[in-house]
């Protein structure tokens, strides 16, 4: 949506390099994964239209081609010197790019998988949010993450202590990701709250997070101090954000490449009571996003103190 890519011709605008700088994440990682005789450079990011403080590092479907190699490197990097540059390369690329644009916060939109790329991104992050839908699959995902994340944490701690990885061109960073919270999204509201069918799933998610997920995270040091959550103004066992389905607004948002709450009446192409209803929804969505943002900012400020 941000890039406005409509066909193969426009998609070429984020392929390869420009003036020696990579144009997407895969090209940015290529020096490490393809053993090129050059160091990783900052990616040439795209500025988000209408926001001079927001930049996008384009993704690339070809990043999946590095998944197997990265997985091998993360399992055997302690003994295979030839692979030692890979585990630390992703965070190095992110830091290098962030520094070139004076970026304060980096948000990573991860795919719903438990592969090596996500393991690496998670293990080298500072905070993580878990998106959920009020459905069966998310309730199962809670149990899956309860077992997987502690294992990833143990691997990351071991990797950070390996001399081989610390002597690499891109040293593996010592990080301890902390649970920032979770988001429940895409439910159908009725009278401003989830309908009874969706509320049943929301209740199950809250129960799973509070009684299964969070205790497991506490045991392996993946939770922030209780005082930090209090400073943020929320309980980590409750959703930091509950976001209803955007319905028809999302189509207009994508068409005009603006957030749903910034769509104008002309862009909505509606009149009368239909327009009033859409604008009321826009105001509600904006309020929800702002409240969640304030919670996150207060929490990060409390961490920095």
What are these regions (language model features)?
Residues 1-305:
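P-loop NTP-binding core
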């Amino acid at each position: 949506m941000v890039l406005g890519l409509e066909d193969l011709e426009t998609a070429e605008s984020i392929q390869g390099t420009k003036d020696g700088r990579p144009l997407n994440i895969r090209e940015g990682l290529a020096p490490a994964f393809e053993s090129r005789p050059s160091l990783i450079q900052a990616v040439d990011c795209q500025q988000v239209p209408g926001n001079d403080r927001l930049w996008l590092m384009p993704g690339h479907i070809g990043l999946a081609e590095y998944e197997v190699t990265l997985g091998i490197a993360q399992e055997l990097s302690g003994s295979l010197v030839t692979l030692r540059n890979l585990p630390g390369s992703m965070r190095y690329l992110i830091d290098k790019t962030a520094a070139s644009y004076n970026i304060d916060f980096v948000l990573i939109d991860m795919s719903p998988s438990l592969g090596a790329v996500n393991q690496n991104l998670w293990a080298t992050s500072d905070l993580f949010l878990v998106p959920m839908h009020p459905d069966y699959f998310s309730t199962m995902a809670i149990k899956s993450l309860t077992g997987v994340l502690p294992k990833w944490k143990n691997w990351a701690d071991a990797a950070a202590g390996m001399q081989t990885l610390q002597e690499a061109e891109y040293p593996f960073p010592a990080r301890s990701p902390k649970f920032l919270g979770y988001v429940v999204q895409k439910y159908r509201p009725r009278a401003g709250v989830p309908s009874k069918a969706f509320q049943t799933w929301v209740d199950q998610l809250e129960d799973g997070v509070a009684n299964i997920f969070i205790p497991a995270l506490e045991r392996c040091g993946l939770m922030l101090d209780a005082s930090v959550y209090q400073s943020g103004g929320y309980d980590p066992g409750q959703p930091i954000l509950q976001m209803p389905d955007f319905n028809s607004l999302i189509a207009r948002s994508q068409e005009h490449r603006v957030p749903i709450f910034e769509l104008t009446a002309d862009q909505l192409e509606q009149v009368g009571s239909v327009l009033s209803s859409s604008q009321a929804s826009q105001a509600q969505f904006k309020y929800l996003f702002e409240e969640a943002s304030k919670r996150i900012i207060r929490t990060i400020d409390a961490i920095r103190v």
